[in-house]
């Protein structure tokens, strides 16, 4: 997968390219990450990348020419079929279903805004989609871009040891994840649920499903409204509700 990043702070993305699962994906050539700094496309000795907004007001906007040239350079390297995304508070909120959609693309370009944002005409002519990671304001698009990359990279074949890890994570099936346990068997008087050590795979599956449904109902009940539950899930959920009322 190719991901181009238009950013004034390419050094920040070492967190993606050099560490953890995404860093390993880069080393294995499963994920290619390229940064394009608008400063490298300026024409003045000061490498100016901001400009005043028409109409006045506080703050500055990213200068059109360097930003547009950086986007064009990213598009040229990516080639045909690339999707350009602008990280923006006005964008579609990133949820697991959206991550799954974005993971279907083999080429993405992420535009990271700074200052008060970018010229609306660039959004109209250069950007395919706007995405947001939440209803709050950050100082730039770099952290949202890193969040998106980390989430999407998990679906690249070979990035995770087992694809089931991505498929079974919280939200992947619309439910919160079940509790997990490892050694020791007892920790500060707390023990591992016996069913997990029983070796009975069907009982373990049912226990995990029950835990996921219970956690989702108690912590994020609105998620259940979006799901088409199976008959088994409905039965388990009704039992959970009857036992907790």
From Swiss-Prot:
Gene3D superfamilies xref list: 3.40.1280.10, tRNA(m1g37)methyltransferase, domain 2
Q: What is its EC number?
A: 2.1.1.228
UniProt keywords (A-Z) are: Cytoplasm, Methyltransferase, S-adenosyl-L-methionine, Transferase, tRNA processing
Recorded catalytic reaction(s): these are:
guanosine(37) in tRNA + S-adenosyl-L-methionine = N(1)-methylguanosine(37) in tRNA + S-adenosyl-L-homocysteine + H(+)
Which GO cellular component terms are attached? cytosol
Pfam families per the UniProt record, alphabetical:
tRNA_m1G_MT
So where does S-adenosyl-L-methionine get bound? 113, 133-138
The keyword Cytoplasm belongs to this UniProt entry's keyword annotation = yes
Enzyme class name: transferase
The cross-references to HAMAP family, in alphabetical order and at most eight, read: TrmD
Q: Which NCBIfam families does this UniProt record tie to the protein?
A: PRK00026.1, trmD
Its function, per the record, reads: Specifically methylates guanosine-37 in various tRNAs.
Q: What's the protein name?
A: tRNA (guanine-N(1)-)-methyltransferase
| Species of the source | Actinobacillus succinogenes (strain ATCC 55618 / DSM 22257 / CCUG 43843 / 130Z)
